[in-house]
A protein has these predicted regions:
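Conserved protein kinase catalytic core
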Residues: 86, 162-164, 204
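Glycine-rich beta-alpha junction loops
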Residues: 157-161
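Residue-level detector of intrinsically disordered/flexible regions characterized by low predicted structural confidence
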Residues: 153, 177-181, 200-202
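Single conserved hydrophobic/aromatic residue that forms the stacking wall/gate
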Residues: 194-204
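N-terminal capping/small domains of soluble enzymes
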Residues: 1-147, 153
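Short glycine/proline- and acidic residue-enriched helix-loop micro-motifs
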Residues: 24, 28, 188, 193
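Glycine/aspartate-rich loop-and-adjacent alpha/beta segment that forms the canonical ThDP
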Residues: 164-178
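Alpha-helix-loop-beta-strand connector modules within alpha/beta enzyme cores
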Residues: 118-126, 175-188
Length: 204
């Protein structure tokens, strides 16, 4: 098995593709409909650049900042994202990693872990809600997040229902039960060598 440490998102994506069932990876990596917004978002990173000032004597250097009153060690927030249950600890693992680096956790409404659990793992958690349902339903979601210790709300206004994919949406189980295990078994067995290698490394 390769070193558990990796330095880039591209390497994380390569490892995920090797280990996950094809349908799960396909749902994780693809955008809605033609995927135009996803491609535009990725392309926007190519338009950004850094011009570091390495010369000169600046006494205090730091990337820390504040967002909604929360202190960040660097200007990064974990975006609220679904499908994190591809890891057994799901959002809890991500929340702990973010807390370890001093950055907030954005928790999706479609998370596999509760806002109570995640807010306990990361004291700077922002809860994401969709602008759907009636006023009372929205108020209940906000109040639950507040009571759980969430420090802010991320409101998604441009999506309120499931969009299809032009290439077809893969089947993703809502829970891993016997039926789901049987259905995903062929895809898992196709990656059995990778899984056995990882299991052996954990046993030694």
């Amino acid at each position: 098995m390769a070193n558990a440490w990796f330095e880039t998102v591209a390497e994380a994506q390569r490892r995920a593709q090797r280990r996950l069932p094809a349908s799960v990876y396909g749902a994780l990596i693809a955008g809605s409909e033609k995927g135009l917004s996803m491609r535009d978002n990725l392309d926007s990173f190519d338009q950004l650049g850094f011009a570091p000032h390495v010369a000169g004597n600046k006494a205090n250097r730091g990337m820390d900042t504040t967002v909604m009153g929360q202190q960040l060690s660097m200007p990064v927030i974990i975006s609220p994202t679904g499908v994190q249950a591809v890891h057994p600890q799901g959002e809890l693992a991500v929340a702990r990693a973010a807390a370890n680096r001093g950055i907030p956790m954005g928790l999706s409404s479609f998370a596999s872990k509760s806002v109570e659990e995640v807010a306990q793992a990361n004291q700077s958690t922002f809860f994401q809600i969709y602008w759907s349902g009636d006023r009372d339903t929205l108020a209940q979601r906000v109040e639950r997040a507040r009571n759980a210790g969430a420090k802010g709300i991320i409101v998604t206004l441009d999506w309120s229902f499931s969009n299809g994919r032009d290439w077809g949406s893969p089947w993703i189980p809502e829970k891993i039960d016997l039926k789901a295990a049987f259905k995903l078994a062929p895809e898992v067995l196709a990656r059995s060598e990778e899984h056995m290698s990882e299991l052996q490394s954990r046993l030694h």
